[in-house]
């Protein structure tokens, strides 16, 4: 991506002298002059946690009557698309959840986001074809263990693991038949766990699921048109510029029906439900001319508004209707009413920011989600800017914490200051040949610095911009199966030794996060290799 220059390693000790207007319940948090940056600088009741997803951590794919998911089949059918890795064992969270909850306790976290695997509950996708009692009990045991340790569960109903039987029967989310089946499954989880779980997410990253799986084909089920750059030659079927919109339309309708069921669930009273969105923040490229000042907001409509606009206002953003035309499905008036205000909070998975440039000449004969947005955000433009050239050699993405604050302020202003939870935020790295070196892997200076800067940016959004953020979940508790990267990308606070019994090892970032969540008394000198201290 951008050109990266190594600078001498710098020490960082965070000192916080924070002032500002007082927020009623957050008076101490936003007026503290304590030099130590700790959780006390955040509002009372703010949840700090970590996050995982069932397919990425559980393993045990053939235990407890679990059925196959779309990703099980994808990793076996196209092993080259996932670095020849699969999640049959993953990090064995299915068997080790109790010891992993002890790690959460060591971190001083009070929240944990995890997903329920649809085929572990309904092995064949529908209740009439059988319920796995072992699967149902597993999640009861997990939730009970979390609660016994004072950890609040945040449950994702669907994190990309469509039951393969539904894929085979009617194409999964390509068919509107999925709406009824998903709603049945979601309602089952609400009725089963709703008295214990009060924070729910229907869908994780519907934008990524739709675009990556059905428009560029680099995630399951790997569908795209042959003309898609980089991935087209690897796609065996699909129709870019069409299928992603159908899939997302069905997800939105399934979300609306599931939320309706949730709000009618007696056990679920007092609970909240939403979607975990995954927008980057976008800055206008310096090559953008003045007549095109809207590439940033236009692209945010396509990446965030695609799903947030309907669940707030009942319909797609006007920019999407204008650019996509007849290929964008339409909602009926009844569907619009059901979608409107169908989220109690907005989940945000934030990792990075990107530059956006108006795309003058998309080819109408080769439609795709990106060409429809009329915005080019190719990484090649990054080297023209110093501000975003913050990417150590091992990092998976550019790092820009200011983008988080900008994004949150945008959501506040455009969507009526909703409650927001940071449902994922994390730093991934590929250590290459040094991946098995504990000395290198555990000294994760960059991740520690990343967390610090993003928490500072989050604090500014809450205290200076008055954004209503109520929780932060770091991705991830531990290294795990990272989709097309397999096990090469590491995002965890704990290192998982894949060659030695999946042993967990505490990283420097885990030590810092634990201290931050305790009292911040332990000072760390953090080394970093970012070109500018603008994160």
From Swiss-Prot:
EC supergroup of this enzyme: hydrolase
Localisation: Endoplasmic reticulum lumen
Catalysis: reaction(s): Hydrolysis of terminal, non-reducing beta-D-glucosyl residues with release of beta-D-glucose
GO CC terms of this entry: endoplasmic reticulum lumen
UniProt superkingdom: Eukaryota
Residues the record marks as carrying a glycan: 187, 468, 501
Sites where the protein binds a beta-D-glucoside: 56, 159, 204-205, 351, 424, 475, 482-483, 491
GO molecular function list: beta-glucosidase activity
Keyword Hydrolase: yes
Active site: 205, 424
Motif (Prevents secretion from ER): 532-535
Keywords carried by this UniProt record: Disulfide bond, Endoplasmic reticulum, Glycoprotein, Glycosidase, Hydrolase, Signal
Signal peptide: 1-24
Stated name of the protein: Beta-glucosidase 20
